[in-house]
Amino acid sequence: MFASFIFSGDNKLTEKTIFNCGDLDILVVYYTIATQFRKFLPHYIRWHLYTLLIYILPSFLTTEIKYKRNLSNIHISGLFYDNRFKFWTKHDKNLALTEEEKMEVIRNRGIPADVLAKRAHEFEKHVAHESLKDQIPAVDKLYSTKVNKFAKIMNLRQSVVGDLKLLTDGKLYEGKHIPVSNISAGENHVVQIPLMAQEEILSSSASDFKTAMVSKSSKPQATAMHVGAIEIIIDSFASPDCNIVGAMLLVDTYHTNPENAVRSIFVAPFRGGRPIRVVTFPNTIVQIEPDMNSRFQLLSTTTNGDFVQGKDLAMVKVNVACAAVGLTSSYTPTPLLESGLQKDRGLIVEYFGRMSYVAHNINQPQEKDLLEGNFSFDIKSRSRLEKVSSTKAQFVSGRTFKYDIIGAGSQSSEELSEEKIQGKAKQVDARLRQRIDPQYNEVQAQMETNLFKLSLDDVETPKGSMLDLKISQSKIALPKNTVGGTILRSDLLANFLTEGNFRASVDLQRTHRIKGMIKMVATVGIPENTGIALACAMNSSIRGRASSDIYTICSQDCELWNPACTKAMTMSFNPNPCSDAWSLEFLKRTGFHCDIICVTGWTATPMQDVQVTIDWFISSQECVPRTYCVLNPQNPFVLNRWMGKLTFPQGTSRSVKRMPLSIGGGAGAKSAILMNMPNAVLSMWRYFVGDLVFEVSKMTSPYIKCTVSFFIAFGNLADDTINFEAFPHKLVQFGEIQEKVVLKFSQEEFLTAWSTQVRPATTLLADGCPYLYAMVHDSSVSTIPGDFVIGVKLTIIENMCAYGLNPGISGSRLLGTIPQSISQQTVWNQMATVRTPLNFDSSKQSFCQFSVDLLGGGISVDKTGDWITLVQNSPISNLLRVAAWKKGCLMVKVVMSGNAAVKRSDWASLVQVFLTNSNSTEHFDACRWTKSEPHSWELIFPIEVCGPNNGFEMWSSEWANQTSWHLSFLVDNPKQSTTFDVLLGISQNFEIAGNTLMPAFSVPQANARSSENAESSA
């Protein structure tokens, strides 16, 4: 009863067993014995004996142990079972102390005073746990019945019965733990949900004897029950730690249509231990009949059931709460049932650590079901025997009544058109006439052709074959002297799509919402003894004289193509990354841009110029948005970061190429930075790590062969290192016409995360960030002249982890920099610095003014003197300029630093700050502040960036007349309020989408702005 010991196969609690146990286990044994023994003693001696067993006897036994036990490395396991709270505990201990050490501890310290007190507290806490109760609400909480005054005074419950024979009109029925058949260990099993015991239904069935015995004064017997709640209790026999998951369908078998029959779907783990409790509120009136228990059924199945076939997986029992419904009375639901539970429809009781899912089927009639339904009435009376003569009679058929109500959608428009052509006047035409003719007092069609029935307002995406969906064809000249970096064509995508007249050309121009992606198929045939690398890139917008470098244009949607390896190139893309639809007018007004450039020139010069043909289609594949939540990176994180073009000359010399993985700060040299949207997102974080997926493309003739080894290492390794391939590496060898290879380096190859941005002047020795190495494994050789050239692009980062926000570093390294991470705190990035004119003439006017474009990164000043302005290339500043679409909260901080030489008592400067959507005077201010604090002040406020494209906004776009956010300053006495710094921060919900092609950003340096050059470009 108290305990059982498992010790070397012996299950007896002997003196030898006790003295071979550790002291802690002895205390547990005596504590268990004392606790159990205490409840059998009288109250007045219970605590005296309990104290004796708990405090005195263990101390005595511990002192005696040193003479009897032989300590060694013994492993014992104790299992204790308590009948009061059904609680198993396990104690494992390795005894490895010497006898002298153990006895010395006991002799000096004794038994800790609070050990037994803590165990007693834990015991009482477990004893206080309540049992697993039924979760079905009480039936009198679901229904309201009439209760006489005496019952109200005595606080009596409503009339609740548990026997069908006593169930009369107005009474409530409550069934507890009605047994149900067990669930077998199979893929599918059907369990009937009884509403009451089957023997009660049979015993209460109507008979002649019972009809004769019913008293006239008795209440009428109930003919039906309103089922308010059913609780299905499933006790699984499976292990409590198994992964069996079951799905259950609650089915109303009186419906034959599955859309009406399936009431609810429940998914829950079929683990043992605690029961599965499914509570549903059917809100169904069930007729009392012998087959009433077969109406509701529970269909169960398991996806990964490993229980032995033929064995029961679980037992099932049911609780029900119903109200009797008869000819003279009905039920009255309480607000709890009608307004609360019936809206929930059902639930699964979730215990701690157990997940469950519930779905309910609702198949209510729609308006079209009422208008288009056909109703037919065909009623015949019974035949009757009529007397014809005194010697003859015959059966006469009864009268017949037939009437049809035909719905509006019962006849197709094709049938109606055919009837009109044939000149047949049908009765059904009357319901189609839409205008009243005063002459004939009837409804007439407006025209001979029923335009109201024609689908002229079809807004669906064009559909059909590839020929039906072809919208345009473009021809791209590829001269025989083309070299790397040549721009073959750079134009708006709308201009590409409006070339030619094909079947879908008109659909493209006249459809408001096109949900299919744009598919381009480029073809050209060139011989295999030459090769060329072309890039087709799509970007959401373009500003100014944007750079067409492959690093800048390939970040959104780009395909690298070597026609010598692949004769045809196919690419599908979504031109609206914020949503799932687009239109031609949208492409025109947002400036969606297409670039086709040559990345690597001809391996061998062809004899004539070449022409590439590009066919444009509307794809049947639907558009999928791709947005970036800046502070919560998606998985996978689409980057499309160009790592570089690697050239390996023919021969046996070992060439080593390094590509830095600190890729967040853009690419460039000391005086300029190339930046795109995904890299700007990465630059928001301080450190990052993840699984890196690279795409390696062959950019020369397939006849040039080489095996290249790729591995990760630090950048300070010398080129003549002899054991490069001691690192984990991947060998790449292209097939005959193979064009691309995908490489993946997991984060297991990186010890920690690394910085996203490194100063340009940092040496390789002091870098400390990993590099991607590419090295010739054997040799590069061919029968034709030319180098072996490959292009490397970092396409996605999987399982990315980012740490800390990045304030930013001025400048960029020559092939890129590195990503950073997230934090809840706001880290401010400096965007702009403005110094009022030093040569300001206060005799002409007492104020000056300037404006900062917060989203576009521009500064506008007046002509009151020589201004000093500075636009910083901070991470947020870069992000706002290269992200085409933006949505979310942007934090703005303005810091004014005044002339410190002015005394506080002499301060006489006032600054007014205006927040507007445009610099035009016709726009009202969104907010206005007035600051007059001497020497310095701060202003912090949020801006909610939101726009028309699924909440995203594009900077100063003609589409939907989008503008920007401008912060204008009116400075009175600018010789005192001199320097203004504008800083930006983003919130957790800030999202971006699409890339804007931008010119290279110059490394910021203080520029003296004259009055003639009054506006700063982005």
Swiss-Prot record:
Signal peptide: none
GO CC terms: host cell plasmodesma; T=3 icosahedral viral capsid
Region of interest (Involved in tubule formation by the movement protein), ranges: 401-407
Keyword presence, Oxidoreductase: no
Keyword Aminoacyl-tRNA synthetase: no
Keyword annotations of the record: Capsid protein, DNA-binding, GTP-binding, Host cell junction, Host-virus interaction, Inhibition of host innate immune response by virus, Nucleotide-binding, RNA-binding, Suppressor of RNA silencing, T=3 icosahedral capsid protein, Transport, Viral immunoevasion, Viral movement protein, Virion
Family annotation (InterPro entries): Como_LCP (IPR003181), RNA2_polyprotein (IPR003182), Viral_coat (IPR029053)
Molecular function GO labels: DNA binding; GTP binding; RNA binding; structural molecule activity
Gene3D superfamilies according to UniProt: 2.60.120.20
Site feature location: Cleavage: Q446, M447, P819, Q820, Q1005, A1006
Pfam families: Como_LCP, Como_SCP
Source organism, top-level taxon: Viruses
Gene Ontology BP terms: symbiont-mediated suppression of host innate immune response; transport of virus in host, cell to cell
Swiss-Prot/TrEMBL site (Interaction with the viral RNA) positions: K463
The protein's name in its UniProt record: RNA2 polyprotein
Lineage: Viruses, Riboviria, Orthornavirae, Pisuviricota, Pisoniviricetes
